[in-house]
């Protein structure tokens, strides 16, 4: 459903900042960096007050809003609860609705129901009823959602498109797309005006049912309504489904209409259109929109570069992708390996593993972080071409890359191929070192010992008995392949 969502103005505004601004310590600046969901924000709130610093309701509400936007729901709930319990803010139905929604996100609708039931009657209005409906819809509880919806209608609380949109989202999320248009029709019959989002949900439903004709009809309906202002997102959503349906000419028409409604400095909008043009294979349009985005958005964030690079790689425009990567390097943006890795993957896709390896080596030489997965990707490309010496070299590098708390397990096919090669070609010392590193990633297996035995036999076989004992200790049984390898020893 992400394609349907409205892009909030504050998300667009957040793309721009002044690097020379003097940072002032605020409650927001104290809470915002606490990204660990297991850590509580209560100590920061209490410490702020105990130090005699002022706290405003407006700032607290802004903090809750920001934390919700960043999906830090537990922290947002803690701030909201602290506001209420300390009396800093006397909750109106609006604050109760936000709090109820957060409870539903963190603890589920059962706990949200309890909060709702304990509210005074004066606070049970369209906002709090709507928040509880959100909780039911989010957890896809159809029975409770529809019963609650009917109760809201009985109480006269269904006077805007928001509630109907929730029910349409419910049907979308459970895959009952055929019911979405019926809700839209009911909305019109009840003289509740649909908004752009209502129509986008409906367009999405028709798209899921491969009904391009009704998508076109919905667009015409919107264009006729004086209370609807057509926006770029609606045309873009429709264009996506025309691309899916193979009607590329109509898709291009809709993309042009979408572009004409883009607001300046709307980088997210340009990014979305770039990805759709890439799906159509239209390199000129991708580059044209990228140039426009650079003109109107004076600062490009890493996500912008990622979007255009992924689009260029998708249409095999690697030369242009290299140029964009050069722009990114000189942009002053913080380093993000995903950006160069997009081009690296593009090289691999075009059997240019030497260039991919060279880029990784350049990054490592300049002290920039890479990932074992990227080195493994290059190693796999070499192995598939039979260039196993290069595959071995890349795998050694991959095993030496710091992965932190993440777990990385190289593919078994690649590991088996490299072990077989290094057993035949590498020194015993090389094999010992490689196997020791590999064991830390995937544990021990028979192929590791076969590589060690083969290498040792080539160097005289002085350690065979020790290796066989180690196999036994590791509970690895000698099989027919092991016996064949052992038979290659020279007789004493």
Curated annotation (Swiss-Prot):
Signal peptide: which range, if any?
none
In chain numbering, the transit peptide falls at 1-17
UniProt keyword annotation of Repeat present: yes
Q: Indicate yes or no for the key word rRNA processing.
A: no
Example GO CC term: the record gives: mitochondrion
Q: Name one GO molecular function term.
A: mRNA binding
Q: PPR repeats at which positions? A: 125-159, 160-194, 195-225, 231-261, 266-296, 301-335, 336-370, 371-405
Put simply, this protein is called Pentatricopeptide repeat-containing protein At4g21705, mitochondrial
Task: State the species of origin.
Answer: Arabidopsis thaliana
């Amino acid at each position: 459903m992400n394609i349907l969502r409205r892009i909030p103005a504050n998300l667009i505004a957040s793309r721009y900042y002044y690097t020379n601004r003097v940072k002032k310590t605020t409650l927001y600046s104290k809470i915002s960096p606490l990204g660990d969901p297991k850590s509580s924000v209560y100590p920061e709130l209490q410490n702020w007050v105990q130090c005699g610093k002022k706290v405003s309701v407006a700032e607290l509400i802004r903090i809750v809003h920001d934390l919700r936007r960043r999906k830090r729901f537990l922290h947002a709930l803690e701030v909201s609860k602290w506001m209420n319990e300390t009396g800093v803010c006397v909750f109106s139905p609006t604050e109760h609705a936000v709090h109820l929604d957060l409870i539903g996100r963190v603890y589920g609708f059962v706990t949200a129901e309890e909060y709702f039931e304990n509210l005074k009657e004066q606070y049970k209005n369209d906002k709090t009823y709507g928040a509880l409906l959100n909780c039911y819809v989010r957890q896809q509880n159809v029975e409770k959602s529809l019963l609650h919806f009917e109760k809201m209608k009985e109480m006269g609380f269904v006077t805007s498109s928001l509630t109907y949109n929730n029910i349409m989202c419910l049907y979308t999320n459970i895959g009952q797309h055929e019911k979405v248009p019926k809700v839209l029709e009911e909305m019109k019959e009840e003289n509740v005006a649909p908004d752009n989002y209502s129509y986008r949900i409906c367009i999405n439903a028709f798209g899921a049912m491969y009904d391009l004709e009704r998508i076109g009809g919905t667009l015409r309906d919107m264009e006729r309504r004086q209370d609807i202002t057509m926006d770029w997102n609606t045309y873009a959503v429709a264009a996506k489904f025309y691309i899916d349906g193979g009607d590329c000419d109509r898709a291009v028409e809709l993309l042009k209409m979408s572009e004409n409604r883009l607001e300046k400095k709307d980088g997210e909008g340009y990014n979305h259109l770039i990805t759709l043009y890439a799906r159509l294979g239209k390199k000129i349009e991708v580059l044209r929109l990228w140039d426009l985005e650079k003109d109107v958005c004076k600062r490009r964030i890493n996500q912008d570069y990622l979007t255009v690079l992924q689009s260029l790689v998708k249409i095999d425009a690697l030369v242009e992708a290299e140029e964009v990567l050069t722009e990114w390097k000189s942009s002053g943006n913080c380093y993000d390996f995903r950006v160069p890795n997009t081009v690296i993957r593009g090289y691999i896709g075009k059997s240019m593993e030497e260039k991919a390896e060279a880029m990784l080596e350049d990054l490592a030489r300049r002290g920039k972080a890479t990932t074992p997965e990227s080195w493994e990707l290059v190693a796999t490309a070499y192995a598939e071409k039979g260039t196993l010496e290069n595959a071995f070299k890349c795998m050694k590098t991959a095993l030496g890359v710091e992965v932190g708390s993440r777990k990385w397990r190289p593919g078994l096919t690649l590991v088996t191929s490299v072990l077989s090669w290094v057993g035949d070609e590498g020194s015993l010392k090389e094999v010992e070192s490689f196997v020791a590193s590999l064991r830390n990633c995937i544990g021990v297996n028979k192929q590791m010992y076969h590589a060690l035995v083969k290498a040792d036999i080539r160097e005289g076989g002085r350690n065979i008995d020790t290796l066989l004992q180690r196999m036994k200790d590791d509970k690895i049984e000698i099989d027919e392949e092991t016996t064949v390898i052992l038979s290659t020893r020279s007789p004493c």
